[in-house]
């Protein structure tokens, strides 16, 4: 087991979970469209305004996990059409950001989303080159769905006046597989 106090000293030293904290989970259909995202942010805003303590976990946008699986599979099969799926998913996230975020927030979010998608594209290209998608590689590919939706929705929450921050779970959770 890694010592997270040493690896993430600020986080480990400053983070404690209040006993009255709620953990809310929203699945893919709940975050499937900009309209649904707006609706769930309104729900979260009411919790926030009531002084509720909560953490939120978001799934990938509806259909994105399946698209990511298909991208990885196509890349491993040497099928360059993985790039078409990649571009569709990338554009869907950028369009959602443009629809959900006002100019200042959009300008902050777009570079992060683009960076995430460039990393995904490089990963898929590596899979394409070696014609192999290991379980670990596919786990990494799939992580982009939740990471991108969570990042984007955190920005929408901030824009709505909720004191929210995106937390990349890879920095605080260690798995054994």
Pin down the residues of each PLM region.
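Nucleotide/pyrophosphate-binding catalytic subdomain
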Residues: 4, 8-177
């Amino acid at each position: 087991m890694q010592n997270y106090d040493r690896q993430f000293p600020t986080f480990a030293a400053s983070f404690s979970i209040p006993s009255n904290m709620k953990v809310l989970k929203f699945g893919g259909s709940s975050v499937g469209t900009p309209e649904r995202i707006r609706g769930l942010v309104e729900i979260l805003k009411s919790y926030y305004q009531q002084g509720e303590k909560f953490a939120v976990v978001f799934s990938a946008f509806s259909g994105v996990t399946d698209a990511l699986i298909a991208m990885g599979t196509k890349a491993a099969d040497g099928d360059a059409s993985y790039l078409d799926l990649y571009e569709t998913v990338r554009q869907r996230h950028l369009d959602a950001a443009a629809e959900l975020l006002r100019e200042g927030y959009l300008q902050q979010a777009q570079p992060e989303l683009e960076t995430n998608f460039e990393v995904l594209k490089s990963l898929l290209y590596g899979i394409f080159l070696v014609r192999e998608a290991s379980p670990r590689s596919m786990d990494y590919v799939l992580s982009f769905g939740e990471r991108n939706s969570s990042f984007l929705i955190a920005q929408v929450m901030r824009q709505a006046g909720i004191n929210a921050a995106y937390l990349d779970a890879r920095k605080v959770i260690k798995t054994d597989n």
